Swiss-Prot record:
Signal peptide: none annotated. This is Dihydroorotate dehydrogenase B (NAD(+)), electron transfer subunit. It comes from Streptococcus thermophilus (strain ATCC BAA-491 / LMD-9). Transmembrane segments: none annotated. FAD binds at residues 51-54, 68-70, 75-76. GO terms for molecular function: 2 iron, 2 sulfur cluster binding; electron transfer activity; flavin adenine dinucleotide binding; metal ion binding; oxidoreductase activity.
């Protein structure tokens, strides 16, 4: 069920240049699932459209959820100035999220993230670990300064970090690491830039439990405006799915990334 609630800002901090981590508190948290997102209304009357931001962590006991976002334009810049005690008009939780019911204790999951696509993998990793699943994360960034959330993922399993320029971790891309694995994961969960998702979609196209979480510009966020559609593969007629409703998570091989 999609709700609208004024969530309270518990804390906010900059964890990397232009990347902020905000903790929100409210009753809505009880309905949140890993891989979903919230739609935030910027506290400025001139900003009409909400901002979709993925949920990074969920603490059901405290009724707190953590989001991580990058300051891109004026709207997110305004969000970055919010402080503890302020409230923000929030619609959510939205989207289908990651399905971890298909993997069992003792099996192995591969998490693949790039840049600001890494945050939703944190709660996924935590819940997989709690389930007894072996978690391996491969995360890619432009450079050392852009690396985020490595410590939280490392608390859940092995982590490989790549940077485009080699300033931290392994020089290259997530594919540089994954293509050298001599094992096949029982499930794959990914979120990141289109180029990275194209790689995951191709690499694991025929995998029965591989998923890509897609980003898209949204307007209404409720499936009515069709501003966030993606195209279904193999359809002769134009068939679209909405990232905000049928997504943001899709099985590999399902949609054109």
């Amino acid at each position: 069920m999609i709700l609208i609630e004024d969530l309270t800002v518990v804390s906010q901090r900059e964890i990397a240049p232009r990347i902020f981590e905000m903790v929100l508190k409210g009753e809505m948290v009880a309905d949140m699932q890993l891989g979903q997102f919230v739609h935030l209304k910027v506290p400025d009357p001139s900003k009409l459209l909400r901002r979709p931001i993925s949920i990074s962590e969920i603490d059901y006991n405290k009724k707190e959820a953590t989001i991580v976002y990058r300051v891109e334009r004026e709207g997110t810049a305004i969000l970055s100035k919010m402080v503890a005690g302020q409230t923000i008009d929030t619609m959510g939780p939205q989207g289908n999220g990651f399905d971890i019911s298909i993997i069992e204790a003792g099996q192995k999951a591969l998490l693949v993230g790039g840049g600001i696509g890494v945050p939703p993998l944190v709660e996924t990793a935590k819940q997989l670990k709690a389930k007894g699943v072996e978690v391996v994360s491969v995360i890619g960034f432009a450079n050392k300064n852009a690396v985020i959330l490595e410590d939280k993922l490392r608390a859940c399993g092995d982590v490989y970090v790549t940077t485009d320029d080699g300033s931290y971790g392994i020089k290259g891309y997530v594919s540089t690491v994954i293509d050298n694995f001599d094992w096949t994961p029982d499930a794959v969960y990914s979120c990141g830039a289109p180029g990275m998702l194209k790689y995951v979609d191709s690499k694991f196209e025929n995998h029965p439990h591989a998923y890509v979480s897609m980003e898209a510009r949204m307007a209404c966020g409720m499936g009515a405006c069709y501003a966030c559609v993606v195209h279904v593969k193999g359809e002769t007629d134009a068939k679209n799915l909405r990232v905000c409703e049928e997504g943001p998570v899709f099985p590999t091989g399902k949609v054109i990334v």
